């Protein structure tokens, strides 16, 4: 964690592209936020890769057209620096901007879905294979996918191995068993020794590679000092007192929990208990512009180059978005109990950079927020299930030596097959977990492309025609949904409808300016509206709720904003209209948007008259 995996991957990609005469790089990341974060870094790197011709670059995910860095590059070649030589340029070419052609550009940054869809039977899948076949493929945070997504990742790796495409997989917390599965997928033409030592290595940082015939490994020595992190158990009631003591002489704290609702609850508790501290929220249920502004502010205040004046007395309460997308440097960390690999990712934000810290915070300390009872937090259980939480709680030590303990701790939690039978409760949780994993794999297998198989006489070759007999997704949006498990998510554009019926941006967005509702907005205004995007909480996407949600949103849009559907940028979008108090009623839920807290919701209370 924090040892330069990205820079090492790009250096390796440059060497392999030169050695094998490849024409570009695909960089896949788990979320749109992480893809946006790496895009700027890859721009500068890609700009140095050719001294003769401009290179095409693409940002490939569902909201790429709303990314300001990406938009500024559209319309031809753009110099990244004012004094850059004329020949050192990158470009976003119009031809590559369609979803079908995006992977054909020389350099592509996107969500991992773009790679997973190469393993999905859908129309034009051959263009994805064509785009990937001439590149070096880099996948970051490859531990971050569930059993469902892993089925598509493994099948994609089988085809990339068949094409002899170099693949670089990055993770700081990858279990050894999963590492072996990834290598076996890529090497599927070759039988690998099931007892080979590389399968069980626990070094860190560990480099594992294959030359097509055998698997090799080396532990890379670090020239940076390690550290010991003290772990302490904590309940929610004890949290304010702990932070009061730890921040008595200044410094900043991070509190990472597993659900947005829990983050909002904790933030309110801390604001009431610690009025002399500044409490900031950071989670996924902010409008895109609000989240971007918060991210930029947090990077300035507690990022790598922050100063004590900006850090002191700041508490950031967030969710999993703090695990992956932000290079934060926290003086003290509180994390809710989560699977061990993710807990270690969170600890990677603690004392991340060398700096002078207040005396009470010079020893790295992480408090693990738990219920204090045998049962798990309901929200955590809904996100991660009970088995991995149970295993993590069982093996959680009193202190962690970084980086020495990273791999052994991950192995302890995930390598349960080598252990003696668990307690009756443990066996029950394990059985439930394994059954759920098998169900995920079964669902994923329905629309997987076949494996690459051919006999010695090339008589039994799988062809693209064979793949199309059972097309799994007919649109790009449907394909993205098909490679991720779970209920569909509902995304909305958030605007305000004031007394009298006028439509406005929220008061702090675009100055709260009004937008005509009876005609399509001009392109510049439509782009600003399209950026007011928000993903509704998961409850609104549940099978028993989603149809009602979409029906009500669509009815309001037809009534008030029908003309907006004539705008290319807004066509097909759902708009959530808030009232003067920034609240709305949707599918028996009351929603409220707040600039500091993001979107909150609760079930509507019906009076007695409604029950008759």
How should these model regions be labeled?
Residues 6-23, 41, 157-159:
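Walker A/P-loop NTP-binding motif
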Residues 101-119, 308-323:
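Conserved two-lobed SF2 helicase motor
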Residues 42-107, 112-116:
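A substrate-engagement module of RecA-like helicase motors
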Residues 1-13, 145-146, 171:
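Walker A/P-loop
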Residues 179, 237, 241-306, 330, ...:
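C-terminal helicase lobe and adjacent C-terminal extensions/tails of nucleic-acid helicase motors
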Residues 127-136, 143-217:
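Post-DEXD/H (motif II) to motif III coupling segment of the RecA-like Helicase ATP-binding lobe
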Residues 190-263:
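Conserved interdomain linker/interface between the two RecA-like ATPase lobes of SF2 helicase motors
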Residues 23-47, 59-65, 174-178, 260:
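Conserved Walker A/P-loop ATP-binding site and its immediately adjacent core
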